[in-house]
C-alpha cells in the first residue's frame, strides 16, 4: 500500500522488490532487483494498493562450472522499498535443495586468469514474520539448444519462388533461399553498398535522406522481397530534416547531414520539390529510465512507430540497452541503467510501443560495448 502523506502536492512513487540470495556457494550481490512498478498519481492523504510479482527463475544464479542457472539451496530474503538504498526485509523464501532451472553452454569462456573481487562480509538480516518454502517439483528445467552446422538444402523446384509464395505457405523460406545465387545472398548481406560521397555511416539510405541505410533491392523485382529502410536512434528518428528533389523525384545533394554538418543545395531547379522530415526529440535512454515508468516508455515507442510509418521507415536501430559498466563510457547517455533487469524492462516497454504500430525495432549495441571513443580497440572479457 502506497500512501501520499503530504498535504499539498500529488505525486507518484516507485515500489521496488529486491532479492538477497543465499550466499552459501556461488558469488552473488547483496541484493538484486526482481520487480518494480510505478504508482498512479496519488493526491495527498490518498493511497493505492499495488501488487508485484516475479518469476521464480529470477532466484537462480549462473554456474560456469556446470553451465547452468541454479537456485541454490538456502534462504532468500525478499525486500521491498523505493530504492536499492531503502529496503526492508519482508519475507524469507526457503529452498531445500539445489534446483537447475536452465541448461546452457559456455560460449564466451575467459582466456586469462582473473582474480575475483570479494566484498567484505555483509550481514543479511532475515525476515521472521513470513516464511515460504519453495516447491521444487513445480519448477521445470529449460534446456537451451544451440545451432549446429546446418545440412545443405537441395531444391528441385523449377518454379521461381517469391516471398508471396512463402507467405502463402506454398513453399518454405529455406526452399526460396536455396534458389538464390551466391551474388544475391552476398548483396542481401551488404545492403545498398553505396560507394559515392553521399554514403556516410549512420546516413547512407538511397530512399530516405538521413536514414541509416537500406537493405538490398536485388530481389524486389524477381522475388517480391522489398528492401527495408533503417533509421538510427535512440533519441527519436534520425532523419535529414529538409531535402530537395527535382520534378522526377531524384534527391539533390545538400542539406543537414550527420552530426549537424550542413551542405548548401546547389543548382536547384525552379520546379524542385522541398520535403520536410521533422521528428520528435525523445528524451535519451538514461533520462527515460529514471522515470521507472514502463507505460511512459510504451507511449514514447508509439510516437516513434507513428513517425516511422509517416516517413516510410521499416526498422529503428534502437533502443540502446548496454549496461552502464564504466562511468567513462562515451555513450552511457544512450543506455538505460547499470541494472540489467531495469534496463531490460525499459527496453521491452519501448519496443512494445513501436511494434504496436506494425513497425520493427533493433535493440543495440554489441554486448559489453563499454568504450567510445575509440570503439574499435576495446577488449571485452566476459564471464
Report each predicted region and the residues it spans:
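Short beta-strand elements
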Residues: 86-105
Amino acid at each position: 500500500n502506497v500512501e501520499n502523506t503530504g498535504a499539498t502536492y500529488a505525486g507518484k512513487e516507485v515500489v521496488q522488490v529486491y532479492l538477497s540470495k543465499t550466499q552459501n556457494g556461488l558469488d552473488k550481490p547483496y541484493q538484486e532487483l526482481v520487480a518494480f512498478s510505478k504508482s498512479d498519481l496519488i493526491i495527498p492523504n490518498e493511497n493505492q494498493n499495488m501488487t508485484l510479482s516475479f518469476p521464480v527463475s529470477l532466484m537462480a544464479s549462473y554456474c560456469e562450472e556446470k553451465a547452468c542457472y541454479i537456485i541454490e539451496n538456502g534462504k532468500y530474503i525478499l525486500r521491498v522499498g523505493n530504492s536499492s538504498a531503502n529496503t526492508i526485509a519482508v519475507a524469507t523464501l526457503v529452498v531445500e535443495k539445489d534446483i537447475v532451472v536452465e541448461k546452457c553452454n559456455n560460449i564466451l569462456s575467459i582466456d586469462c586468469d582473473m582474480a575475483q573481487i570479494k566484498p567484505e562480509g555483509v550481514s543479511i538480516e532475515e525476515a521472521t514474520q513470513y516464511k515460504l518454502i519453495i516447491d521444487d517439483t513445480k519448477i521445470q528445467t529449460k534446456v537451451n539448444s544451440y545451432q549446429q552446422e546446418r545440412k545443405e538444402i537441395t531444391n528441385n523446384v523449377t518454379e521461381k519462388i517469391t516471398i508471396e509464395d512463402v507467405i502463402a505457405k506454398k513453399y518454405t523460406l529455406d526452399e526460396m533461399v536455396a534458389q538464390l545465387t551466391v551474388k544475391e545472398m552476398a548483396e542481401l548481406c551488404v545492403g545498398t553498398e553505396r560507394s559515392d560521397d553521399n554514403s556516410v555511416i549512420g546516413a547512407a539510405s538511397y530512399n530516405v535522406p538521413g536514414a541509416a541505410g537500406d537493405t538490398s533491392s536485388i530481389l524486389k523485382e524477381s522475388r517480391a522481397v522489398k528492401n527495408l529502410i533503417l533509421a538510427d536512434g535512440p533519441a527519436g528518428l534520425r532523419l535529414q530534416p529538409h531535402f530537395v528533389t527535382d520534378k522526377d523525384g531524384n534527391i539533390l545533394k545538400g542539406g543537414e547531414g550527420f552530426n549537424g554538418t550542413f551542405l548548401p543545395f546547389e543548382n536547384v531547379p525552379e520546379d524542385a520539390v522541398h520535403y520536410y522530415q521533422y521528428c520528435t526529440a525523445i528524451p535519451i535512454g538514461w533520462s527515460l529510465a529514471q522515470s521507472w515508468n514502463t507505460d511512459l516508455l510504451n507511449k514514447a515507442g508509439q510516437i516513434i512507430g507513428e513517425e516511422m510509418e509517416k516517413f516510410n521507415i521499416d526498422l529503428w536501430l534502437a533502443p540502446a540497452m548496454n549496461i552502464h559498466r564504466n562511468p567513462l563510457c562515451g555513450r552511457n547517455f544512450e543506455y538505460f541503467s547499470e541494472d540489467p533487469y531495469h534496463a531490460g524492462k525499459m527496453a521491452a516497454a519501448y519496443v512494445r510501443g513501436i511494434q504496436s504500430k506494425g513497425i520493427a525495432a533493433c535493440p543495440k549495441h554489441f554486448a559489453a560495448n563499454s568504450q567510445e571513443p575509440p570503439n574499435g580497440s576495446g577488449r571485452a572479457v566476459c564471464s
